[in-house]
């Protein structure tokens, strides 16, 4: 690393227009990762860069890419059509767009009299197909491609696209690109590219990729690790707060009311919980329970790409105090200026994602604060667990302030206004249980230790839903705060009279109720008839059994009589045969006597 972090001490002279871009963007000096990486990557070295979040990694690879495009004359008319010079891959559309914006920020200062340098974004959208991307590529002839693995792979496999001129590949958030979600696409992409190329891998959690980095075709790579006692930059303050899960939402509103911030990002565990709590917080804003006038935004992975882009742009460009409710879709690599507060309602299932979330604030030496809510009990072991990973968290003693109304009564009344809200609350609750069961740190985040009732109250449920985890939970021991039928309120809510605001849905519900009522009436009638006819049916059954026995006895008697008759006939026949035999014997004896007399007379004659 250079002794000085001045740009003049980089080891080579940056192109004048790149230097102008740095000045305009406010990069007065290099960060340690930039000072270490730029000379290596710009000078024919493969690099594996592991540096804390918010340390300027994007500029550390964008500058070498632009330098090489010029140095290798890819910015001339000699550069072949249907070829490209550099490929930058990122795991999400949002991060890809952000990298594109950094590249374009530098290109704004590119001399207009030179052959233009262009970049093209390759991300899946409903607005453009892969064929559209290829058409734009052939028409505009960009030297730099930026995109997500799936779309990049589809693009490179098109016959019209040539890959032989590609001399540099950069993988941002490389550990993510090498995990199970993307590894197949990433490997296929790299097989389509020339082996003689420069490769750069960048991430704040590069260590988690392990030996998978060697699947990227690195040749004698230089490993750059910006050492730090703490994974968080010094400008980022990491805090945690141990709280009863039922009070999390109220504490969140209290923080939004009492903390001074320009922009705040609140991380929720699931997409459905984002949209659910977003609706309620908007309701609180209308009722002036949110003291500070803040603009609330919602962003999650189930939204259409165009909606996500629009929301992220609106939040980034907002001049008023703003809060973004989101999931991990906005956790990696995204650089939003002026974010000075991050709140996590629950820790992420992947512990590596923890620092990526926190790292949305405290970037580029700006002051930032990240607060994580932990449930009381076993989850408190998360603190020493993160210490092993060089992440130090300081406990914050927070109290609910500035909420004069009965918060949970307001929450319940809001839910009772529309049955659809209750349905979404149940879905959010079930999704959270599944989310929690997939946690990587299973020794800390265990379903057996989860406060199911407290979580249910957080999501505004009136009763616990039917699911295997709840059945198991209730079977272990008698739980407090649960009334018969798994109700959490007494008296229970009359679900038959609980209506949807949407007239169409309510009409469907009423029809369903009628059908259920008819079915129940039929079952009831059948049951009553069964009871009424029980004595009669018993008598009939007894008569039938008697007749059956009589028939059996009659058949048996008949069979015995026939057998006796047969035996009698056999005896008579035997007597007749004996008589005949005696007659035959008598006749034979008579014949013998006659014969002997005849013989005797003849001898006398001699």
Swiss-Prot record:
Region forming the signal peptide: none
Record domain Helicase C-terminal: where: 248-404
Disulphide-bonded residues: none
GO terms, molecular function: ATP binding; ATP hydrolysis activity; RNA binding; RNA helicase activity
Enzyme Commission code: 3.6.4.13
UniProt motif DEAD box: location: 172-175
Sequence similarity: Belongs to the DEAD box helicase family. DDX55/SPB4 subfamily.
PROSITE patterns: DEAD_ATP_HELICASE, HELICASE_ATP_BIND_1, HELICASE_CTER, Q_MOTIF
Residues the entry annotates as binding ATP: 51-58
Enzyme class name: hydrolase
Miscellaneous comment in the UniProt entry for this protein: Present with 5740 molecules/cell in log phase SD medium.
Keywords: ATP-binding, Coiled coil, Helicase, Hydrolase, Nucleotide-binding, Nucleus, Phosphoprotein, Ribosome biogenesis, RNA-binding, rRNA processing
Oligomeric and partner information: Component of pre-60S ribosomal complexes.
Compartment(s): Nucleus, Nucleolus
Renumbered ranges of motif Q motif: 7-35
Name of protein: ATP-dependent rRNA helicase SPB4
UniProt xrefs under InterPro entries: CTT_SPB4, DEAD/DEAH_box_helicase_dom, Helicase_ATP-bd, Helicase_C-like, P-loop_NTPase, RNA-helicase_DEAD-box_CS, RNA_helicase_DEAD_Q_motif, SPB4-like_CTE
GO CC annotation: 90S preribosome; nucleolus; nucleoplasm; preribosome, large subunit precursor
Gene Ontology biological-process entries: assembly of large subunit precursor of preribosome; maturation of LSU-rRNA; ribosomal large subunit assembly
Main location: nucleus
Reactions catalysed according to its record: ATP + H2O = ADP + phosphate + H(+)
